[in-house]
A protein has these predicted regions:
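Flexible, acidic/His-enriched mid-domain "rim/lid" segments that flank
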Residues: 3, 79-178
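Compact, glycine/acidic-enriched structural inserts
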Residues: 55-84
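Terminal domain-start leader segments
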Residues: 1-54, 79-90, 108-117, 151, ...
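Short helix/loop capping segments that flank catalytic or ligand/cofactor-binding pockets
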Residues: 33-34, 62-63, 103
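Structural motif
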Residues: 26-28, 55-57, 76, 95-100
Length: 178
């Protein structure tokens, strides 16, 4: 939980420094980094004071379990997130430019009067470059699993096996640790 708070706090400091009202994050890598959410559908909105996670009814329970410190908001569609942004007078919005489609950009510009956007891609990458304790522990665990899987594969591999068979073995072996 502390990790999520720390990550959000670092982004909030950046928002203040750059005079951005909020960051709107929806790509899976940055969404998971900021919220902890492992599902496939959700939007993170970080303002200078709050952090919210928007998702539809299918994922609200999962979000509640995986997104400590973020307010969970149930929505019907992406348009509900845009309505939230518009109703809270968020005019300077940070976006992950590389992940923002033309359709979404147009919807934001249409839905939020006088909206200014700024790319936050490089800042999120900078934040993610410095590993916290949770990430270090995950990397260590992944290395342990990889070492065990490689050792097991070395014992079972034989001439005539295809790459697909070896891959399937490794995938199945590693999934056993999750």
């Amino acid at each position: 939980m502390q990790t999520t708070y720390s990550r959000v706090a670092r982004l909030q400091a950046y928002l203040k420094q750059e005079s951005l009202d909020a960051a709107f994050v929806f790509d899976s890598d940055n969404r998971r980094y900021l919220s902890g959410f492992r599902g496939s559908t959700g939007y993170v909105v970080v303002t200078q004071k709050n952090a919210l996670f928007f998702t539809d009814f299918r994922y609200t329970q999962q979000a509640g379990e995986q997104c400590p410190g973020l307010e969970i908001v149930s929505i019907r569609s992406e348009a509900d997130v845009i309505s939230y942004l518009a109703s809270h007078t968020l005019r300077r919005l940070g976006l992950v430019e590389a992940e923002t489609s033309v359709r979404l950009y147009k919807a934001l510009k249409t839905g939020i009067e006088h909206l200014e956007t700024a790319a936050i891609d490089s800042e999120l990458l900078r934040l993610r470059m410095v590993k916290d304790a949770q990430e270090c522990a995950s990397i260590r665990k992944a290395c342990e699993i990889t070492d065990l899987a490689f050792s097991a594969m070395c014992k079972m591999i034989r001439p005539g096996m295809t790459e697909a068979e070896v891959d399937r073995f490794l995938q199945d072996y590693m999934r056993g640790f999750l």
